[in-house]
Amino acid sequence: MTALHRPAPTGAPVGRDRGGPLADHAEQFAKQLASATELGLIPDPDAVRAVWEDAAAPDWAGPALWLHGDLHPANVLTADGTFCGVIDFGDLFAGDPACDLAAPWVLLPDGAADHFYGAYRPAPDAATLRRARGWAVLRALVCILIGDAGVHGRPGGKPTWGPPAHVTLRRLVATAS
């Protein structure tokens, strides 16, 4: 990710619904949390809401960086448990790196996010890490709902997306400040 997150030139595309201010997604968060809770998929919505509220950090003030924007298990390739590639660069755009920095919460095993952030350069500041957790909550809720739709045969559903999203949410809640 360090190699990708470089300043984008003027005129680079911006994300359709990612990479901008996290606060712009408050309504989306509330709707997704309500839907997932109503379906019985979220055992402690208040804990999830607390993670989201903690992510209300100052907006990114640095230059717009190149972002993948869609880092989740279906877009990461592995071989024998080792990352070996990333696919689906169709959303490549410029914005706040916190959007991509949500990926360790979604992709890595328990306890690995801090190691990832320790190796990422330049080292992300506290506000960026808080926003990354907010992006991870959004991604987890979306994937939980897509997974549930798949389990129940609804259009657009992908049953394999739910389990890793539940793990992501559990990690975020367990590590909340």
Where are these regions (language model features)?
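A cross-family kinase active-site recognition segment
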Residues: 1-45, 61-64, 92-94
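Surface-exposed alpha-helical segments enriched in charged/polar residues
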Residues: 2, 6, 34, 53, ...
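Generic structural signal for secondary-structure transition and capping sites
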Residues: 6-10, 57-60, 149, 177
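N-terminal alpha-helical segment
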Residues: 28-29, 97, 137-140
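Short glycine/proline- and charge-enriched loop/turn segments
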Residues: 31-33, 84, 100, 150-153
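Central P-loop NTPase core of STAND/AAA+ ATPases
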Residues: 40-51, 55-56
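Active-site Asp-x-Gly
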Residues: 64-65, 72-133
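Helix-rich C-terminal or lid/interface subdomains of diverse kinases
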Residues: 103-177
